Curated annotation (Swiss-Prot):
Organism: Oryza sativa subsp. japonica (Rice)
Bilayer-spanning residue ranges: none
Molecular function via GO: DNA binding; pre-mRNA binding; U6 snRNA binding; zinc ion binding
Keyword tags: DNA-binding, Metal-binding, RNA-binding, Zinc, Zinc-finger
Lineage: Eukaryota, Viridiplantae, Streptophyta, Embryophyta, Tracheophyta
Domain RRM intervals: 228-301
Region (Disordered): 329-348, 379-486
Superkingdom: Eukaryota
Compositional bias (Low complexity): 389-407, 415-430, 445-486
GO cellular component terms, A-Z: Prp19 complex; U2-type catalytic step 1 spliceosome; U2-type catalytic step 2 spliceosome
Keyword Iron: no
Zinc finger C3H1-type: from-to: 157-184
Protein name listed in UniProt: Zinc finger CCCH domain-containing protein 49
Bias (Pro residues) ranges: 431-444
One Pfam match: Torus
Length: 486
């Protein structure tokens, strides 16, 4: 290889690429993927030549994935560089070759020298624009491939591996462990080899798929010869009525196509029974339209309705089961007018009350003292505007006062500034507890101010004795007069 390096630096046989060749399942559902590119990091597991390795994480809960084979070996088999499944159908190489009756292993040598020469020759033809193998990716899919092909990505394949410490019961990471805490699957599928998958020899996954294809049942025509309708399930918004007509018209003349988008299904009715049988035989288990796999079955006739319920439902079909209360009252009273020709005949009694079921009895409502309008002083003024209660309210007030104890109206609350505070609805549906009934304050005797005594006549004042202060002031004077006289 040294002499080739001297002539051409690009002729060393090592792969140089800017992007991998992978399937949609391995790429992941995240549209923003960060890839690590390492030139000549690993050797191909098929041809053992160094190649550019790409490493990325398909999703949040997925493990890191990397390319396993070089692009030269990938193009020879038209497979993914990671999972080694067919890029077009998503099937193993053994299933694809068996279904298409081809053997792609004859053209690929097994020895090291011949394999290297074959890979270099293929690269030279690819750079020159020569298609080395025109069958890969261009063969028409047959019945087996249509039955087994995967029409949607399978992202479950990107899950993390099983934790080996958890299997032994020694994992101490718990929820922080990046691996799955599950028991590994045992059986034939647990023993897989990458070379057997690439060459299509002794692949356990391929053998399981081939056995599944042989066990798929076919559609058996029903015994009723009048059934000419086929049921198509699993419809998508991408499939239109014209697509169904183009797919089914090749097997016979179509009478009607009815699509039920709410149930994601459709019904195709043929004019003849032979056309329906031919379409069911040729499209069973392999109906794919615009990349959407559809389910095909024979239609079933609708179950006949009971005769006794037919008369009861006629009155509710016209009104949707919801009758006006006036009509209900007429039906209950028996005054509903009868149609002409039905006079004197008894009408069925089962058609009156279908949706008009009486309401259940209301639960007992808790009554609080604050809910009594008479106790809270809720009086309505009369229309005369004289500030007196109306006749009804007055009568009720008299009745309440005569029957029991009455309470005066409480004074209005006082707010600072003369404005009432704004009302805010309760937050979060919380309702405040009911207000306690108004309690009248204790009654005290009215306060009477002290008043001066009334004025008296002059004669009466002379007869009355002088106050104590005057007597005390006049005492010494009288005493001196007496002493002087003596």
């Amino acid at each position: 290889m040294a002499h080739r390096l001297l002539r051409d630096a690009q002729a060393d046989g090592w792969e140089r690429s800017d992007f991998p060749i992978i399937c949609e399942s391995c790429l992941g559902d995240n549209p923003y993927v960060r890839m690590l590119r390492a030139e000549y990091d690993k050797e191909c597991k098929i041809c053992a030549r160094p190649f550019t390795v790409f490493r990325w994480r398909p999703g949040r809960d997925a493990r890191y994935k990397k390319t396993e084979i070089c692009q030269t070996c990938c193009k020879l088999k038209n497979v993914c560089q990671v999972c080694l499944l067919d890029l077009e159908y998503g099937l193993p190489v053994q299933v694809r070759d068996t279904a298409l009756s081809t053997n792609s292993n004859d053209a690929i040598p097994r020895s090291d020298v011949n394999r290297e020469y074959f890979a270099e020759e293929h690269d030279r033809r690819a750079r020159a624009g020569i298609d080395y193998d025109s069958s890969n990716g261009k063969a028409r899919a047959n019945d087996t491939i249509l039955k087994l092909q995967r029409t949607a990505p399978y992202y479950k394949r990107n899950r993390a591996h099983v934790c080996s410490f958890y299997v032994r019961g020694e994992c101490t990471r718990g929820a922080e462990c990046p691996y799955r805490h599950e028991m590994p699957e045992t059986g034939e599928l647990s023993q897989q080899n990458i070379k057997d998958r690439y060459y299509g020899v002794n692949d356990p996954v391929a053998l399981k798929l081939l056995s599944k294809a042989g066990e798929m049942p076919s559609l058996t025509p029903p015994d009723d010869e009048s059934i000419r309708t086929l049921y198509i399930g699993g419809l998508d918004s991408r499939v239109t009525e014209q697509d169904l007509r183009d797919q089914f018209y090749a097997h016979g003349e179509i009478e009607t196509i009815r699509m039920v988008l709410q149930r994601a299904c459709a019904f195709v009715t043929y004019t003849t029974r032979e056309g329906a049988e031919k379409a069911a035989e040729e499209l069973a288990n392999k109906l794919v339209i615009k990349g959407v796999r559809l389910k095909l079955m024979w239609g079933k006739p609708q179950a006949p309705k009971p005769e006794e319920d037919e008369a009861g439902r006629q009155g509710h079909v016209a009104h949707g089961g919801m009758l006006p209360r006036a009509v209900i009252s007429q039906q209950q009273s028996g005054d509903q007018p009868q149609p002409p020709g039905m006079e004197g005949q008894q009408q069925p009694a089962s058609a009156s009350y279908y949706f008009n079921i009486p309401a259940p009895p209301a639960a007992e409502r808790t009554l609080y003292p604050s809910m009594d309008p008479q106790r809270m002083g809720a009086l309505v003024e009369s229309q005369e505007g004289d500030g007196k209660p109306g006749p009804q309210q007055a009568g009720q007030g008299q009745a309440s006062s005569s029957s029991g104890q009455s309470y005066p109206e409480p004074p209005p609350p006082y707010y600072h500034g003369g404005q009432y505070p704004p009302y805010y609805p309760p937050y979060g549906g919380y309702m405040p507890p009911p207000r306690m009934p108004y309690q009248q304050p204790p009654q005290y005797p009215a306060y009477q101010p002290m008043l001066a005594p009334p004025a008296q006549s002059q004669a009466s004042s002379l007869q009355q004795p002088a106050p104590a202060t005057q007597q005390l002031g006049q005492g010494p004077q009288q005493q001196t007069t007496q002493n002087g006289m003596t």
